[in-house]
Amino acid sequence: TDWYDLLFRTAFTHQHSVSITGGNDRSNYYMSMGYANNNSVTIGEGLERYNVLAKINTRINRNIHLGLKVSGSLSKAEHPHTSIDVYEYAYNTSRAIPLRTASNELYFYANEAGRNGVLSYNIMNELNHTGNKNDNSAIDVAVNLDWKVASWMRFSSILGLSRSNVTQENWGDEQSYYISSMRQSPYGKMLPNPIEDSEFAERYCLLPFGGELMTTNTRNTSYTWRNSLSLMQSFGKHEVSGSIGQEVRSSKYDGLSSTQYGYLPERGKKFVDIDPTVWKRYGALVKSHPDVVTDTKNNVISLYATAAYVYDSRYILNFNIRTDGSNKFGQSK
């Protein structure tokens, strides 16, 4: 069996985009939409992405310019389950092991001696009954202002807002070897009665029914506001310049990671109830994998000032000062 030929393919990527641009002597705009699809060299692995972009720049008068930029993206990625290393499997698995039987059914070979029977493995079955997917969405908005207050003074301001959401799912159903190993029993075989065979329920069987669903959801909301005022003036051989500015940044992360058991994706993504007082090793498993909540916020404020004096384009004197504050710095006593 040529495992490399069965588990890998020629990577194929295609991208498409359309854009519109236009304007007049006071304003201009640009808009685009794009789509990309990447089928990775590994079967069952790929990425699909959509993105949009819009930019508008306008001159309100001869001294004030205003710009707006909005962009968004949506992507979906699929990978093999984290328990599967396709490259290692193709390299280490004997070529004498077939993928299918003579009747074209999947061929399963003994891979582990479970407590309630031999656990058999087939890589295609494993890829079909497990998965790992990532969904990512993001939107960014930026507004910038440029104001020529006077011939020797200029003010600029930039405000940026962004929001993103990442959802990850790593799952395996009860037909997979991954779950069979947790169950310590091959799929389809009746489990021992946990009352009559308490050792099986207390010491061996991690997950008697259903599969496993691990999910992680992370949301990020952030903004940046930057302002600066610059000055420059010349008096004969003297040239004076300087600037002052501030920047405020804030970023908030909210997330939840959870592992749920008894997952039945083929039955409407429902979950089966399992009594942890009867299946005691399962009860210990649930206790050892509590939900994890993420809730962090980072705030930063920066102030700066610069000044420069030049005489006769030969002698230069510079001055710089900056201060930063953050909720991560702690408190001074």
Task: Kindly label every feature range from the protein language model.
Residues 1, 40-45, 51, 55-138, ...:
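Surface-exposed loop/interface segments of Gram-negative outer-membrane beta-barrel transport/assembly proteins
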Residues 1-43, 81-83, 126-129, 146, ...:
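Residues embedded in well-ordered regular secondary structure
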Residues 12-16, 298-303:
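Conserved alpha/beta core surface patches that mediate binding of polyanionic ligands
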Residues 13, 24-25, 61, 148-150, ...:
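Outer-membrane beta-barrel channels and translocator barrels
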Residues 18-24, 52-58, 141-147, 227-231, ...:
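Residues on the lipid-exposed face of transmembrane beta-strands in outer-membrane beta-barrel proteins
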Residues 19, 30-32, 156, 241-245, ...:
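Structured core elements
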Residues 33-39, 317-329:
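Transmembrane beta-strand segments that form the barrel wall of outer-membrane beta-barrel proteins
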Residues 52-54, 157, 301-307, 311, ...:
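Extended, hydrophobic alpha-helical segments in both membrane/secreted and soluble proteins
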